[in-house]
Amino acid sequence: MAEYDLTTKIAHFLDRHLVFPLLEFLSVKEIYNEKELLHGKLDLLSDTNMVDFAMDVYKNLYADKEIPLALREKRTTVVAQLKQLQAETEPIVKMFEDPETTRQMQSTRDGRMLFDHLAEKHGFRQEYLDTLYRYAKFQYECGNYSGAAEYLYFFRVLVPSTDRNALSSLWGKLASEILMQNWDAAMEDLTRLKETIDNNTVSSPLQSLQHRTWLVHWSLFVFFNHPKGRDNIIDLFLYQPQYLNAIQTMCPHILRYLTTAVITNKDVRKRRQVLKDLVKVIQQESYTYKDPITEFVECLYVHFDFDGAQKKLRECESVLVNDFFLVACLEDFIENARLFIFETFCRIHQCISISMLADKLNMTPEEAERWIVNLIRNARLDAKIDSKLGHVVMGNNAVSPYQQVIEKTKSLAFRSQMLAMNIEKKSNQNSRTEAPTWAAQDSGFY
């Protein structure tokens, strides 16, 4: 399913270290030629200090050739640089290991106070911060993400938000936590980075748009692994205008992930309301991006094309199973998508043949009946089954006029927001730019 693979588009907005897990996944799925993927890895590794990894990839690619001299020399250089930086950083690290310093770090959020404490007790100087940052960056480039995260934490606690490396250190810390799969810490870092970007009054509107676009892509790692991720992704991508604007302007392919998060959301009430807002966005962007997942929603909720929805659902399975971020959502997606087809079909028909439903849901009649029985049993459906006639008779789920007014009022704010964003989007079309080089080609640090 290379046709629907988004790795190339997404990698453009990621740090090169974050691309490696995606390439490993593609290698397992055998979507692309293995040699092409190995060439891609080698190219990504060329500007990192992960020389041993690069050597392993080179051996896999050219089994009958010797390791190039340039790689061997680079390894010697990297080891020498690492030893030098370790020697420079060792006295600084010892300061942080002091029990009193640890207590100070835990009890105060004021970086200036902590800096003054370290200066008074240990002779800490401003240039030590630059040394700490350089060492953290070097550790990251070597693939030692735990070391990078530790030193970047010390750095973040001490530097003011105006420091020239403050923002880049937040990107580096987030990348390190993602690569170590520390999802709670990554969620905290993601929130902190978002606040920094949103409160930045120095960046131009175009720079802020670029930062939000990168954040949207990096956040996929966190949102599809953290327990609260599928709620948070909806709140950020759909209901925060600046981020929805970034998606519509720079990366409409992200709608695949927003749509999946909505469909697989466990809160049934929230899911139904959010779906209405999502459908409007999908309709607006259908001319710039579509795939089986967004088309499934369009078939079902715009065209009421049940045969088309069923066909798209089968295609969705292939898309999900071959998507790095969505493969774990497959079962939830299929289950909830079938429920959506069923619910929509039931709104139109009061009495439904089980065999017809089975056909619409791509199930056997026996499977469909068991599935409906479970829905009724779990109080997710107001209906009765007539086993003799093979029919499902729907209960009366009429919505009160009061509730209808509430629902319509809720949608007014969203429609106003969409109108404002469309105006802004048109004004941004001429200033659309590519991501800066470090997003995909250099480290996550500036």
Curated annotation (Swiss-Prot):
Chief localisation class: cytoplasm
GO CC aspect terms: eukaryotic 43S preinitiation complex; eukaryotic 48S preinitiation complex; eukaryotic translation initiation factor 3 complex; eukaryotic translation initiation factor 3 complex, eIF3e; nucleus
Record localization: Cytoplasm; Nucleus
PROSITE patterns per record: PCI
PCI domain segment(s): 222-399
UniProt-annotated stretches for the region Disordered: 425-446
SMART domains given in the database record: eIF3_N, PINT
Record's keyword terms, sorted: Cytoplasm, Initiation factor, Nucleus, Protein biosynthesis
InterPro entries, per the entry: eIF3e, eIF3e_N, PCI_dom, WH_DNA-bd_sf
A GO molecular-function descriptor: translation initiation factor activity
Domain of life: Eukaryota
GO terms (BP aspect): formation of cytoplasmic translation initiation complex; translational initiation
Quaternary data: Component of the eukaryotic translation initiation factor 3 (eIF-3) complex, which is composed of 13 subunits: eif3a, eif3b, eif3c, eif3d, eif3e, eif3f, eif3g, eif3h, eif3i, eif3j, eif3k, eif3l and eif3m.
Purpose: Component of the eukaryotic translation initiation factor 3 (eIF-3) complex, which is involved in protein synthesis of a specialized repertoire of mRNAs and, together with other initiation factors, stimulates binding of mRNA and methionyl-tRNAi to the 40S ribosome. The eIF-3 complex specifically targets and initiates translation of a subset of mRNAs involved in cell proliferation.
Family: Belongs to the eIF-3 subunit E family.
PANTHER family: EUKARYOTIC TRANSLATION INITIATION FACTOR 3 SUBUNIT E (PTHR10317)
Protein name in the entry: Eukaryotic translation initiation factor 3 subunit E-B
Gene, per the UniProt record: eif3e-b
